[in-house]
């Protein structure tokens, strides 16, 4: 036979009508309804009139009510092992079956009917329990959501910490490597300086040793002559007089006398003043710590029709006649410019350009998106950063406004150092590799790819036809290129 009633529903049917809890020591009245023994006794004590069944309102005799043994056995069978006994009211000794919503406390049925909680809104404990369980579940869910957020935050913090530690380890390794390289370079310069001083010293000492050896030889010869003359002085009078002139002439031989004024003090002049050691070494190291020169070539597709490229697209000069070249967006059609075939969008880069004895030239970098049609707008606002020479005497930086540059002499080789992330483009007088002299520095927020640009300027009827050259990275000293040939 299958059961049609669930356990929770069965428990509801086994509840006392007074305390609304599962029967405890159930008693059956004459009308057939059952109540907890404690509930029935408490109800009888508080009534002055005859006892009536709370369910059917039939008059009954509470003192003659018999235990409902069958119901008690069913309840005993349904009760799980280890279930705690229900708490009871301290006033009526009845189970705490109700919850006073006003006072927020557990009460028994009599407290709600006759006690201090009379007329207060009350709710069965099971209902309150279910409601509070739902509230607890909602609170737990909310806490889980907060815990999830905290877990995500912890994961982000751990990842951030791990990343910081890793980046710190990498940067520390880079610092150690860079300082090791600097120590190596300093040791090289130290050895170079000491070797130079040692060589200079050895030359001076060798010269002095030679003079000292000659002087000592002269001294020995003079001592020998002195000894001979002293012995000659012991001769008898006649012999002394006869030989005196010959002996005196021998003592006066030029090779036996040191030359007057033959000694001239030699000064130690190594070509390096003590106070300038750090500055001189720094100038040498500065070039070594710059990036290796870039092996650049020129891009024929960008060259103005008057420009002639040669030597593997490393030499450019402005010719007298325009060449037939396809008109394309990347080609300059007015300004005599040409770009390098490779641009830079990050990192540190160094390259050099030989300008020789040209009277007019410009060079620098240009944004890849800058217009190449019409006259070139030479200003940082238009994505062009240049310096140049005009009429063989005026050096200027094409900033806003233009900045005259106090350049000493006429450098034949210009070095360019680009630090993309730092937003710096610095130009150097690179005629002396060990003594790069800064000419000007642009500060900018670079965006997009930058290309090295060379502007030969107009040929001026041949007076400014000398070429500009991208020298090979290992090229020693200023380059004097041959005359380029037309493409």
Swiss-Prot record:
Protein name: E3 ubiquitin-protein ligase TRIM50
Family indicated by similarity: Belongs to the TRIM/RBCC family.
Biased segments, Pro residues type: 469-481
Zinc finger (B box-type): 84-125
Gene for this chain: TRIM50
EC code(s) of this entry: 2.3.2.27
Species whose genome carries this gene: Homo sapiens (Human)
Gene Ontology, cellular component aspect: cytoplasm; cytosol
Catalytic activity: S-ubiquitinyl-[E2 ubiquitin-conjugating enzyme]-L-cysteine + [acceptor protein]-L-lysine = [E2 ubiquitin-conjugating enzyme]-L-cysteine + N(6)-ubiquitinyl-[acceptor protein]-L-lysine
Residues bound to Zn(2+): 89, 92, 111, 117
Taxonomic classification: Eukaryota, Metazoa, Chordata, Craniata, Vertebrata
SUPFAM superfamilies recorded: B-box zinc-binding domain (SSF57845), Concanavalin A-like lectins/glucanases (SSF49899), RING/U-box (SSF57850)
Function: E3 ubiquitin-protein ligase that ubiquitinates Beclin-1/BECN1 in a 'Lys-63'-dependent manner enhancing its binding to ULK1. In turn, promotes starvation-induced autophagy activation. Also interacts with p62/SQSTM1 protein and thereby induces the formation and the autophagy clearance of aggresome-associated polyubiquitinated proteins through HDAC6 interaction. Also promotes NLRP3 inflammasome activation by directly inducing NLRP3 oligomerization independent of its E3 ligase function.
Domain of life (superkingdom): Eukaryota
GO molecular function, one term: identical protein binding
Keyword Ubl conjugation: yes
B30.2/SPRY domain mapped to chain residues: 276-475
Major enzyme class: transferase
Segments forming a coiled coil: 125-169, 204-235
PROSITE patterns: B302_SPRY, ZF_BBOX, ZF_RING_1, ZF_RING_2
GO biological process, one term: innate immune response
Mapped zinc finger ranges (RING-type): 16-57
Subunit annotation: Can form dimers and trimers. Interacts with several E2 ubiquitin-conjugating enzymes, including UBE2L6, UBE2E1, UBE2E3. No interaction with UBE2H. Interacts with BECN1. Interacts with SQSTM1. Interacts with NLRP3.
């Amino acid at each position: 036979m299958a059961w049609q009633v669930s356990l929770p529903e069965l428990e509801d049917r086994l509840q006392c009508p007074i305390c609304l809890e599962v029967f405890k020591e159930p008693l059956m009245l004459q009308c057939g309804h059952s109540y907890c023994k404690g509930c029935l006794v408490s109800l009888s004590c508080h009534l002055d009139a005859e006892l009536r069944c709370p369910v059917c309102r039939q008059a009954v005799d509470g003192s003659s009510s018999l235990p409902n043994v069958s119901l008690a056995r069913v309840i005993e069978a349904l009760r799980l092992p280890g279930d705690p006994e229900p708490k009871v009211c301290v006033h009526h000794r009845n189970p705490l079956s109700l919850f006073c919503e006003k006072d927020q406390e557990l009460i028994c049925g009599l407290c709600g009917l006759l006690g201090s909680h009379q007329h207060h809104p009350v709710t069965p404990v099971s209902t309150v329990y279910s409601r509070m369980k739902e509230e607890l579940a909602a609170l737990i869910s909310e806490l889980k959501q907060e815990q999830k957020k905290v877990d995500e935050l912890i994961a982000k913090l751990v990842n951030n910490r791990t990343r910081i530690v890793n980046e710190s380890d990498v940067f520390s390794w880079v610092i150690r490597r860079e300082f090791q390289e600097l120590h190596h370079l300093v040791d090289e310069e130290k050895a170079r300086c000491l070797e130079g001083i040692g060589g200079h010293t050895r030359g001076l000492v060798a010269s002095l040793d030679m003079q000292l050896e000659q002087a000592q030889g002269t001294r020995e010869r003079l001592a020998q002559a002195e000894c001979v003359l002293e012995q000659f002085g012991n001769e008898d009078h006649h012999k002394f007089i006869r030989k005196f002139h010959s002996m005196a002439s021998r003592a006066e031989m030029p090779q036996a006398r040191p030359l007057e004024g033959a000694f001239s003090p030699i000064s130690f002049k190594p070509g390096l003043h003590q106070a300038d050691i750090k500055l001189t070494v720094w100038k040498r190291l500065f070039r070594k710590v710059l990036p290796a020169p870039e092996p650049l070539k020129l891009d024929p597709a960008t060259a103005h029709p008057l420009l002639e490229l040669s030597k593997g697209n490393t030499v450019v000069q402005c010719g007298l006649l325009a060449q037939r070249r396809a008109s394309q967006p990347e080609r300059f059609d007015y300004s005599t410019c040409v770009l390098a075939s490779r641009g830079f969008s990050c990192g540190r880069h160094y390259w050099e350009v030989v300008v020789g004895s040209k009277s007019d030239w410009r060079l620098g970098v240009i944004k890849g998106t800058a217009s190449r049609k019409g006259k070139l707008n030479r200003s940082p606002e238009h994505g062009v950063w240049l310096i140049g020479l005009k009429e063989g005497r005026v050096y200027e930086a094409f900033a806003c406004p233009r900045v005259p540059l106090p350049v000493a002499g006429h450098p034949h080789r210009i070095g360019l150092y680009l630090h993309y992330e730092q937003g710096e483009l610095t130009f150097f007088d690179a005629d002396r590799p060990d003594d790069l002299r800064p000419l000007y520095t642009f500060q900018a927020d670079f965006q997009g790819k930058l290309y090295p640009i060379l502007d030969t300027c107009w040929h001026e009827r041949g007076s400014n036809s000398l070429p500009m050259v991208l020298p090979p990275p290992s090229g020693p000293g200023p380059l004097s290129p041959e005359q380029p040939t037309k493409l």
